[in-house]
């Protein structure tokens, strides 16, 4: 890679991180497009990677939010674990900024669930006395297909949750992250517990040192 291209990607990543921090949004794709447009870039090959943007975002958050971000992130991960344990029959996976380590107190918790039908998840939410809003999301999958996925939003203890419900299949095709078109990075209950235990024992602000990310393949 040329030094000029590398420098441009770093500038776009920094600008995207600045947008994400200032707008308090998790929309990585929007921030990247807006940052690229500011630099007159439209070619995909000149865009920074997810890792580059997230690293720049963590640096911005440390400067702007300080300990406030780390405290919010830890609370969100603890709340995510509670929700995953309450919904463990659906083999939940945590995805998104709460897992990546870039969430703040304006972020929501996003979980991927497996169920034979979406109604099974609704019954579980009803049993937990949780009111919800039904949504839909368009996603691409690892086999090249494109599908509409049922989603359910709810709020608990002033934290927003988004549940995405996928078919309960033995060899389920993997949903792709809209930003980089790769399988979502994810953590199951066991992995999230390990992450929290590691963070509590080490007191580390650095997510990548505490827990290696994996693409969405495992549950439990």
Each model region followed by its residue ranges:
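Catalytic core of pol beta-like nucleotidyltransferases
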Residues: 2-25, 32-105, 115-220
């Amino acid at each position: 890679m040329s030094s000029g291209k590398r420098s441009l990607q770093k500038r776009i990543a920094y600008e995207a991180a600045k947008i994400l921090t200032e707008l308090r949004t998790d929309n990585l794709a929007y921030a990247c497009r807006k940052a690229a447009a500011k630099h007159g870039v439209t070619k995909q090959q000149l865009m920074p990677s997810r890792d580059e943007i997230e690293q720049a975002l963590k640096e911005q958050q440390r400067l702007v939010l300080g300990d406030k971000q780390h405290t919010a992130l830890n609370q969100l991960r603890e709340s995510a674990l509670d929700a995953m344990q309450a919904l463990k029959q659906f083999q939940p996976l945590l995805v998104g900024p709460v897992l990546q380590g870039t969430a703040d107190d304006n972020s929501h918790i996003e979980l991927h669930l497996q169920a034979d039908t979406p109604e099974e998840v609704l019954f579980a939410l009803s049993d937990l006395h949780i009111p919800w809003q039904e949504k839909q999301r368009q996603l691409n999958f690892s086999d090249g297909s494109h599908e509409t996925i049922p989603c359910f939003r709810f709020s608990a203890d002033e934290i927003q949750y988004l549940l995405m419900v996928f078919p309960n299949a033995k060899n389920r095709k993997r949903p792709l992250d809209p930003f980089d078109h790769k399988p979502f990075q994810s953590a199951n209950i066991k992995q999230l517990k390990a992450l929290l235990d590691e963070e509590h024992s080490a007191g580390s602000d650095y997510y990548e040192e505490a827990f290696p990310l994996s693409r969405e393949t495992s549950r439990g």
